[in-house]
């Protein structure tokens, strides 16, 4: 089945921009076929549902093994898991949410996940994003819904290196990837 699945970015990524010293100033990659589940849940909010941790603090991420849960709103989360995990996760979460008003949806094909890493990753994002991405304000484990180059994205900082994951609608992924590559060009010169 894998040979029938395609990404809109398969001919663009991975991509890296070397600085004058030869080390990558910024690199772009794609997390292909990551499973994504949307969860809407009415209060009271549990700390876990179906064994999946729910961050209750705004704009935070909870991690348990390979499952990441991003807080998107007071009653909304995005759960990501490795390829093939959705049927089991959907079952667990749906069963756990059966006694409360909830919506559990497989969103796996709706967004592409672009990974941005390297010493200039933050500077690249700051070119098109109005969020304060300074390390005091946006740290590993932070996430936010925002605009990047005018497109709605979900931004998830995964490490202090820094590295980020950008969740973008599948239909806009190629345009955003082209924008990122073009915007990164200035970082070819070390400085």
Residue spans of the language-model regions?
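Basic, glycine/lysine-rich polyanion-binding surfaces/domains
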Residues: 1-191
């Amino acid at each position: 089945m894998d040979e029938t699945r395609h990404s809109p970015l398969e001919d663009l990524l991975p991509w890296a921009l070397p600085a004058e010293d030869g080390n990558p100033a910024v690199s772009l990659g794609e997390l292909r076929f990551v499973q994504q589940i949307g969860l809407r849940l009415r209060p009271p909010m549990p700390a876990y549902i179906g064994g999946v941790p729910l961050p209750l603090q705004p704009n935070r991420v909870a991690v348990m093994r390979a499952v990441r849960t991003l807080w998107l709103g007071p009653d909304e989360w995005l759960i990501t898991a490795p390829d093939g995990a959705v049927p089991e996760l959907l079952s667990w979460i749906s069963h756990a949410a059966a006694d409360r008003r909830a919506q559990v949806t497989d969103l796996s094909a709706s967004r592409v996940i672009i990974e941005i890493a390297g010493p200039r990753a933050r500077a690249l994002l700051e070119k098109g994003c109005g969020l304060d991405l300074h390390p005091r304000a946006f740290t590993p484990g932070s996430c936010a819904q925002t605009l990047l180059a005018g497109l709605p994205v979900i931004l998830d900082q995964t490490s202090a290196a820094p590295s980020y994951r950008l969740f973008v609608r599948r239909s806009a992924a190629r345009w955003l990837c082209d924008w990122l590559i073009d915007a990164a060009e200035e970082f070819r010169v070390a400085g």
